[in-house]
Amino acid sequence: MAGGNFELVALGNPLLDMQIRNGEAMLEKYGLKPNDAVLADEKQLAIYQDLVDNYDVTYVAGGAAQNAARCAQYVLPANSTAYLGCVGKDDLAKQLQAANDKEGLKSIYQFSDDQPTGSCAVVITGHNRSLCTNLGAAEKFNKSHLDTAEAQKAIKNAQTFYLGGFFLTHGVESALVLAEEAKTRDVSLTMNLSAPFIPQFFTAQVDQVVPYADVIFGNETEAAAWAEAHKLESKDLKTIAQAIADFDAVTAKAQARVVVITQGSQPTIVAKRGETQQYVHETPKINPADIVDTNGAGDAFAGGVLGALVLGKTVDEAIEVGHKLGGMCIGQVGPILKFPKENVL
């Protein structure tokens, strides 16, 4: 595969992460769980200024699908990835663009006139991370942006699309445009469940997109939320992964759907549509002393898997690459990888 054609195009919510450590008091104050992701309610909107006033904040480029796309680019030739999302006309957007430029991800942003770039409070406690998001401009993404010349060029070249589950809270119409494009051209549509509240409260939107998807990522809590939303009685992760794999399929590629469920340091589970046996991939052991924080580890894993699949690797080989990038990410502050690049293929 030659680089330069934007083989992978991701769609999601571009956010600037505002990360703090030792945030136990913040969890209690704002009613957050240690290892969760939520959209900020009215009471929680005060958290962003609170962090700035009372903590040493580290600012890092975030947004789950944007993180995954940057991590996919890490293993791909130059100019292989592009990202679609909506930002404000502000300094936060410039910071996101600069991070993407540095790591070789092409930003095809829509700009909102009246909303600031979205932000995400990342509260680190021990090896856990709690995410509290104010979408801002991100939820102003308009389907018309997909028709712009720059977006069309990337979309028509894409061999793989990646949808962040978070995007489905407001952008299912845009997601379905890419899903239909994937179906028409028989290319890959991949997606991430992203957080328990997505399959739990946006079940209808998830169920609209899943039939087009041939690779679906999630973690153990997201899989459990999907099972509950679909009245699946089993709590067994292999059974749940298989149920997601066997869900409706409307494209040729989705007929061979692969579902990948991570569970932190525990083995990664893989289910393939129509099969009776699931596969278990051991996660490389990491010394707890080497863990800086886990923010973005799941995105790094997904990005590694996607990048490897775009390169034509098998699912097993791709998961190995994903584990390497996830392991690398938790040794850094925030959702970033080591530079100069290390060969993980």
PLM feature spans:
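Cofactor-binding loop segments of dinucleotide-utilizing enzymes, especially the Rossmann-like FAD-
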Residues: 11-13, 85-89, 112, 124-126, ...
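Glycine-rich phosphate/adenosyl-contacting loop at the front of the ribokinase-like
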Residues: 1-82, 94-95, 291
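Beta-strand->loop->alpha-helix junctions that form or flank phosphate-binding loops
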Residues: 85-89, 106-117, 241-246, 259-263
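A short, aliphatic-rich alpha-helical micro-motif
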Residues: 151-156, 209-210, 253
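Conserved beta-alpha-beta core of the PfkB/ribokinase-like small-molecule kinase fold
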Residues: 160-242, 266-268
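Conserved phosphate-binding/catalytic region of the ribokinase-like
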Residues: 1-21, 34-35, 180-184, 228-345
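Conserved phosphate-binding/catalytic loop of the ribokinase/pfkB sugar-kinase fold
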Residues: 103, 108-112, 120-168
